[in-house]
Amino acid sequence: MSLTPEQVRQVAHLARLKLDEDEMERMRLQLSSILDHIEMLQAIDVTDVPITAQVTDLTNVTRIDAVTSSLPVDAALANAPDRQGDYFRVKAVFEE
């Protein structure tokens, strides 16, 4: 499917793109190629292919959200280069 320069201008306008003539021609060729591939895909008979949302049959594996014991604060902060009370102290990232 070959697009006309006017069709490419319309797409560029809708996408709020400012294209010069060289870019317009390059886009025309690229978009035409993409549409050719889409036409090939549309020609494939998929009537016997089952509808799928995903192909791997994987599901999310989750765990029960339960409170459990964790690492004690002193053990967690044992190798911290700097701490303030029960917290890691780090250099400021944002200015105040």
From Swiss-Prot:
Top-level EC class: ligase
Catalytic reaction annotation: L-glutamyl-tRNA(Gln) + L-glutamine + ATP + H2O = L-glutaminyl-tRNA(Gln) + L-glutamate + ADP + phosphate + H(+); L-aspartyl-tRNA(Asn) + L-glutamine + ATP + H2O = L-asparaginyl-tRNA(Asn) + L-glutamate + ADP + phosphate + 2 H(+)
Statement: the UniProt record of this protein carries the keyword RNA-binding: no
GO terms assigned for molecular function: asparaginyl-tRNA synthase (glutamine-hydrolyzing) activity; ATP binding; glutaminyl-tRNA synthase (glutamine-hydrolyzing) activity
Record key words, sorted: ATP-binding, Ligase, Nucleotide-binding, Protein biosynthesis
InterPro entries listed in its UniProt record: Asp/Glu-ADT_sf_sub_c, GatC
Pfam families reported for this sequence: GatC (PF02686)
Keyword Ubl conjugation: no
A single GO BP: glutaminyl-tRNAGln biosynthesis via transamidation
EC number: 6.3.5.-
Subunit structure, interactors included: Heterotrimer of A, B and C subunits.
Cross-referenced PANTHER family: GLUTAMYL-TRNA(GLN) AMIDOTRANSFERASE SUBUNIT C, MITOCHONDRIAL
Family to which the UniProt record says this protein belongs: Belongs to the GatC family.
Biological role: Allows the formation of correctly charged Asn-tRNA(Asn) or Gln-tRNA(Gln) through the transamidation of misacylated Asp-tRNA(Asn) or Glu-tRNA(Gln) in organisms which lack either or both of asparaginyl-tRNA or glutaminyl-tRNA synthetases. The reaction takes place in the presence of glutamine and ATP through an activated phospho-Asp-tRNA(Asn) or phospho-Glu-tRNA(Gln).
Name of the protein in its database record: Aspartyl/glutamyl-tRNA(Asn/Gln) amidotransferase subunit C
Gene responsible for this protein: gatC
